[in-house]
Amino acid sequence: MVPLCGKWGEAVRVLRDKRLRRYMLAAGVFISFNWGAFIYCVASNRVLDASLAYYINPILAILVGFIVFRERLTTAQWAAVALAAAGVAAPMVMEGEFPLLAVLIGLSFAIYGAIKKKADVPGDVSTFIETLLVSPVALGIILVMELRGGPISTGVIGGWRLILLPLAGVVTYLPLFLYSAGIRTTSMSLSGILMYINPT
């Protein structure tokens, strides 16, 4: 989007700003962990953890909004949060173990949202820069996984899969861009509640 919209100047301005550059790098690290952990869950048959993470995330996003941004909720909203927390706790109790990976996935996205809100950089520019900063590491990980093989091998080096990998980036860019644009003017608590619209 940045090259297409001619926003190189804005991107360069953000990259030159030490504080904003740190925010963008941190955002890139947290979203990379979030997606990497989600993919690991799916690839290793831990689908419950992957699904549970997206029920935990809204609660954590609301708490981050309350603690970091001093957002206030009404009594009815706190009651809704408590009901959601009870709904999330039920499968944890039934499973008999603490879903650490699910909590980390949910927490990483809540922190990602807080970073994007604090940075207050236009959505297209921030998504472009965070992707740019973590791309070398991501490409290195893909290469290592391919060379080693195993259950989390992506199978993308060579053939038509090599074409699909960049296209997957295009498809996943749009939701991140929209989220990045929206979180600048939306409270963390409202964004957390809206996360329950997500398919899990």
What kind of region is each of these model predictions?
Residues M1-R16, A84-E97, S135-W160:
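Membrane-interface helix-cap regions at the ends of transmembrane helices
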Residues M1-P3, E97-G150:
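Transmembrane alpha-helical segments that form core, pore/gating elements
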Residues W8-A37, L100-L104, I152-L174, M195:
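Loop-to-transmembrane-helix transition segments
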Residues Y40, N57-A76, T200:
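C-terminal transmembrane-helix exit sites in multi-pass transporters
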Residues A76-M92, V103-L107:
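Hydrophobic transmembrane alpha-helices of multi-pass small-molecule transport proteins
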Residues L25, C41-V42, I67-F69, A119, ...:
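Hydrophobic/aromatic residues within transmembrane alpha-helices
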Residues L52-I56, G123-L133, Y173-T200:
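Helix-helix packing/entry segments at the starts of transmembrane helices
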Residues M1, Y40-I59, G96-S108, G158-V170:
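Structural signature of hydrophobic alpha-helical transmembrane segments
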